[in-house]
Swiss-Prot record:
DNA-dependent RNA polymerase catalyzes the transcription of DNA into RNA using the four ribonucleoside triphosphates as substrates. Its main location: plastid. It holds the Pfam family RNA_pol_Rpb2_3. CDD domains: RNA_pol_B_RPB2. In plastids the minimal PEP RNA polymerase catalytic core is composed of four subunits: alpha, beta, beta', and beta''. When a (nuclear-encoded) sigma factor is associated with the core the holoenzyme is formed, which can initiate transcription. It catalyses: RNA(n) + a ribonucleoside 5'-triphosphate = RNA(n+1) + diphosphate. This is DNA-directed RNA polymerase subunit beta. Gene3D superfamilies: 2.40.50.100, 2.40.50.150, 3.90.1100.10, DNA-directed RNA polymerase, beta subunit, external 1 domain, DNA-directed RNA polymerase, subunit 2, domain 6, RNA polymerase alpha subunit dimerisation domain, RNA polymerase Rpb2, domain 2. GO terms for biological process: DNA-templated transcription.
């Protein structure tokens, strides 16, 4: 194969570029535009005039650094200052001041926003582009209905339709519609103009004939009145007035007919109009052209639109979302200033610009947006890959978008226009499948919100190949060769037949017909999917699971890079911000665990390292230096590794020696058997940091106090507290230990009920105020080492005084039975048993296997990539090599992956003199010995080095047992859930199981005493303490009494009657 001589080489883009570019556009253009649009404000008497000089705005530098904002739990933001002028026209006085409009949260170097000390990310939304879309559908009777939907920039819609009787309507709502003639006349057109600009004017004439003389519309005024009556459902006679016209303009035309720049471009292109781009509203001629096109489609001229095509969608990035919020905030500010000017007019003193402008609208609007908007999300910080993927996410949900329940399968499905723009594999599992997607590696968003993908142009004249970016609508008319086919030999390329894409179809065509070719085999996939080696050998569903589980991988205390990868690991780690890189060349003058100092030619650069910091997902963020003192480094060289990185590469898991074989049923149903070596050598040990919070407020009875003096509790529980009542850093705390001592004053009435309180008040007249303890204690499963205590917030105002204390506890978790582990190919399982090393199956050189996987998990799941990976990993382990294999290597030759694996295994066998590594009779398999008996297993077994991940689904977070705890007030049954110390109900099927075994007494206990029999509970406790027999309950349980009460509330009386056998007397007894 001979490659072309001159090719413009591609480089991988920065993975978080979409976030930085979006925020840059907001600061540079969006902010200026919205400030420029702020109007001059006058009072009703036109005595005062207020205006902002938006071009001279200033954004102040943030007063603190990003890291300090996280530590102090405040927002990393910049203050916005704008010069303002207030003019008093009567006296000719002018006051100019620089006013503070508010704070705008700033994007940090990671591409996220720090709001109240928490990292948040703004998701890019993908939704219908404003414009017009035509469609045809069948009604209930099977008659085709042709529709044209005009989507405004606000997301509101105006629907035109031709029904089965060829009448044309404009639909106002689901139930109401108005004749198109009424709407066109109301917009200012006359009948002659309407009929002269549509094909088949008979259709519109037919609409006119159906109207009686009384209903016939003579003028625009009549049409406006008719439209107003239809929209507001008003009957009877109504006369035209200017107020009706203004109301219609405001409520109907302005909301449904504002197209925006993108909508105007789309409409001009679709309907072949020549309207200026700055005309953002729907004009009468636009609607007339839309009706004309709809009539043409009815008669077979023109093609309906594909709603799901990406050319009909646009991406709302950070720019648009923040600009919308700024617009809303400035509207609120405008209303506030108008009210302030009105108030100042009534008073005598002259206001100043500073007294009129308040920062509240801007601050509260952005606070609401970042706190509660569905597209502003809590950054997923489980590992570095998760952060990068979260920033590149595309969501169809949110305001103006789709909803989980109403979205159809068609919307969720993969579309041919997604190729190279949206990853066909990466999406959520469950309700959000297909609605939340991810950008492909090389995709980017242009200024109009369209997704673009790069291609090489192929020219017959020149040998050069230039790169060009095309959107989804632009590449339809080209033959595009796929990225996983090689450039062909120059001599016979014209004779070669190449697979290509053309007009949303896959075709085979001659090379001389090809116009463009893809630049990279992984161009179609997202970052997470591209990290799966031998991706082409996996079923897409398992690849999806493999990616989703990489996002859930917990950073380990000793990271290890994979033997078999795809080559994208280093850039993923770099773009996530987890590794620290030298910004300039120089010499390391100082390094320790907390900082690195680099001496360059001009200056000394100090970099602070992050030490044991908690992430949003309670995993540990920790950076370790990789360089030595006095070492010379180049620009771009790695100075420090972060969590889940090793040598500057992403390292989410460990290379583990695995065997695919059954072992005594312990790997039934995907369960996994592991060696105790993984525990003793801390191979799967991870560090987790939990944060516990307590707040001391001023209550109506007095202030809450943080103190060490807690008389209610045993001194043993308070042993770790210092003099001020806070736990000492470095203390090892167990469940129930007090972290922060706090006393809350009780109400006086409650204090009076205590006998000693009454006595003291009667004798000495002392009012006794008692306090109850509301200490912060270590919850169940929260044991660990206290690493930090923060007084986060201390604010004194006229009404409140609050103190917030955060306590951070570090836990070191080893792998254990019940933890979930997974590979990169969707092969997941739960640890079922931990075996001693000597009992594990071992190789012919005596090495015990670390993990035993079920072989039945491979054929039915069709994820054969894991076998290629583990065999190549085994060869790499013996040869001391690392492999970076780009997926789709079959483009070189058939069976390329298999040939690579077997050749490397053969080479490893030859170099290490281990013939069992590659046996020609059973390639890829080897004889394995039983660790318990020393006998060889009957069948050869597939063994290899697989890269296995420990996932965040850990048994410590999930397992829960209850001996006693709280009960629900109504049913008197135990509460539900681990957080409430609840229990589990015995349901119908569990009762059947106990009945089947005849466990009558156990069943009775579960349904009464252990569940909801209040009286029996106390009797059982007394019987256990005194050693008596447990009495049989005589009364009904609470759930039965509840049922009776509910029946009584429905006027159905249910009584308990006892009939005496001797006297035959009836005795009523309350249930």
């Amino acid at each position: 194969m001979i490659l072309r001589k001159k090719i413009e080489l591609f480089v991988l883009p920065e993975f978080t570029e979409i976030q930085f570019e979006g925020f840059h556009r907001f600061i540079k253009y969006g902010l200026v535009k919205e400030l420029n649009d702020f109007p001059k404000i006058e009072d009703t008497d036109q005595e005062f005039e207020f205006q902002l000089f938006s071009r001279q705005y200033q954004l102040a530098e943030p007063p603190i650094e990003e890291r300090d904002a996280i530590y102090q739990s405040i927002t990393y933001s910049s203050d916005l200052y704008v010069p303002a002028q207030l003019t008093e026209r009567k006296k000719g006085r002018v006051k100019k001041q620089i006013v503070f409009l508010g704070s705008i949260p700033l994007m940090n170097s990671q591409g996220t926003f720090v709001v109240n000390g928490v990292a948040r990310v703004i998701i890019n939304q993908i939704l219908r582009s404003p414009g017009i879309y035509y469609n045809s559908e069948l009604d209930r009777n099977g008659i085709p209905i042709y529709t044209g939907t005009i989507i405004s920039d606000w997301g509101r819609r105006l629907k035109l339709e031709i029904d089965g009787k060829t009448r044309i309507w404009a639909r106002i709502s689901k139930k109401r519609k108005v004749s198109i003639l009424v709407l066109l006349l109301a917009m200012g057109l006359d009948i002659e103009e309407i009929l002269g600009n549509v094909c088949y004017p008979k259709l519109l004439l037919g609409c006119m004939k159906r109207k009686t003389k009384k209903e016939h519309l003579q003028s625009t005024e009549d049409a406006i009145v008719e439209l107003y009556k239809q929209i507001y459902c008003i009957g009877g006679d109504l006369n035209f007035s200017e107020s009706i016209s203004k109301e219609l303009q405001k409520k109907f035309f302005q909301q449904r007919c504002e197209l925006g720049k993108i909508g105007r471009l789309n409409l001009n292109k679709k309907l072949n109009l020549d309207v200026p781009e700055n005309e953002n509203f729907l004009l009468p001629q636009d609607l007339l052209a839309a009706v004309d096109y709809l009539i043409k489609i009815r008669f077979g001229i023109g093609v309906p639109d594909d709603i799901d095509h990406l050319k009909n969608r646009r991406v709302r990035s950070v720019t648009d979302l923040l600009q919308d919020q700024l617009k809303l905030a400035l509207n609120r500010l405008e209303n506030s200033i108008r009210q302030a000017i009105r108030g100042a007019n009534r008073r005598e003193h002259l206001p100043t610009p500073k007294s009129l402008v308040t920062s509240t609208p801007l601050i509260t609007t952005f606070k609401e947006f970042f706190g509660s908007h569905p597209l502003s999300q809590f950054l997923d910080q489980t590992n570095p890959l998760t952060e990068v993927v979260h920033k590149r996410r595309l969501s169809s949900l949110g305001p103006g978008g789709l909803t989980r329940r109403t979205a159809s399968f068609q919307v969720r499905d993969i579309h041919p226009s997604h190729y190279g723009r949206i990853c066909p594999i990466e999406t959520s599992e469950g309700m959000n499948a297909g609605l939340v997607a991810s950008l492909a590696i090389h995709a980017k968003v242009d200024n109009w919100g369209s997704l673009e993908s790069p291609f090489y142009k192929i020219s017959g004249v020149s040998e050069e190949e230039d790169m060009t970016f095309l959107s989804a609508g632009e590449d339809e008319n080209y033959h595009i060769a796929t990225g996983n086919c090689l450039a062909l030999n120059q001599t016979n390329q014209e004779e070669q037949v190449t697979p290509a894409r053309y007009r949303q179809e896959f075709v085979a065509t001659a090379w001389n017909q090809i116009n463009l070719r893809s630049i990279f085999p992984l161009q179609y996939f997202s970052i997470g999917t591209s990290l799966i080696p031998f991706l082409e050998h996996n079923d897409a569903n398992r690849a999806l699971m493999g990616f989703n589980m990489q996002r859930q991988a917990v950073p380990l205390s000793k990271p290890e890079k994979c033997i078999v990868g795809t080559g994208l690991e280093s850039q993923t780690a770099l773009d996530s911000g987890s590794v620290i890189v030298a910004t300039e060349g120089g010499r390391i003058s100082y390094t320790d665990g907390r900082r690195i100092t680099l001496l360059t030619k001009e200056k000394e650069v100090e970099t602070k390292l992050v030490i044991y910091q908690r992430s949003n997902n309670s995993t540990c963020i920790h950076e370790k230096p990789r360089i030595q003192l006095r070492e010379y480094v180049k620009k771009g060289q790695i100075l420090a590794d972060g969590r889940a990185t090793a040598g500057g590469e992403l390292a989410l898991g460990k290379n583990i020696l695995v065997a695919y074989m059954p072992w005594e049923g312990y790997n039934f149903e995907d369960a996994i058997l592991i060696s105790e070596r993984l525990i003793h050598e801390d191979i799967y040990t991870s560090i987790h940091i939990e944060r516990y919070e307590i707040e001391a407020r001023v209550t109506s009875q007095g202030p809450e106090r943080i103190t060490r003096e807690i008389p209610h509790l045993d001194n043993y529980l308070l042993r770790h507290l210092d003099e001020s009542g806070l736990v000492l850093p470095g203390s090892w705390v167990e469940t129930g230990d007090v972290l922060v001592g706090k006393l809350t004053p009780q109400e006086t009435e409650e204090s009076l009920r205590a006998p000693e309180g009454k006595l003291l008040q009667a004798i000495f007249g002392i009012q006794v105020v008692t306090a109850k303890e509301t200490c912060l204690k270590v919850p169940l499963g929260g044991r660990g080492r206290v690493i930090d205590i923060k007084w986060i917030y201390q604010e004194k105002t006229s009404t409140t005084y609050a103190e917030i204390v955060h306590v951070y506890i570090l836990q070191k978790r080893e792998i254990q039975v019940g933890d979930k582990v997974a590979g990169r190919h969707g092969n997941k399982g739960i640890i079922s048993k931990i075996l001693p090393r000597q009992d594990m199956p071992y190789l012919q050189d005596g090495t015990p296997v670390d993990m035993v996987l079920s072989p039945l998990g491979v054929p039915s799941r069709m994820n054969v990539g894991q076998i290629f990976e583990c065999l190549l990993g085994l060869a790499g382990d013996f040869l001391q090599k690392h492999y970076r294999v780009t997926p789709f290597d079959e483009r070189y030759e058939r069976e390329a992956s298999r040939k690579l694996v077997f050749s490397e295994l053969h080479e490893a066998s030859r170099q290490t003199a281990n013939p069992w590594l590659f046996e020609s009779d059973n390639p890829g398999k080897s004889g394995l010995l039983d660790g318990r008996t020393g006998d060889i297993f009957e069948e050869p077994v597939t063994i290899g080095k697989a890269y296995m991940l420990k996932l965040i689904h850990q048994v410590d977070d999930k397992i829960h047992a209850r001996s006693s705890g709280p009960y629900a007030l109504v049913t008197q049954q135990p509460l539900r859930g681990k957080s409430r110390r609840g229990g589990q109900r015995v349901g119908e099927m569990e009762v059947w199981a106990l009945e089947g075994f005849g466990a009558a007494y156990t069943l009775e206990e579960m349904l009464t005493i252990k569940s909801d029999h209040i009286q029996a509970r106390f009797e059982v406790l007394r019987a256990i303490v005194t050693g008596e027999l447990i009495p049989k309950p005589e009364t009904a349980p609470e759930s039965f009494r509840l049922l009776v009460r509910e029946l009584r509330s429905l006027a159905l009386n249910l009584d308990h009657i006892i009939v005496s056998e001797k006297e035959l007397r009836i005795k009523f007894k309350d249930i």
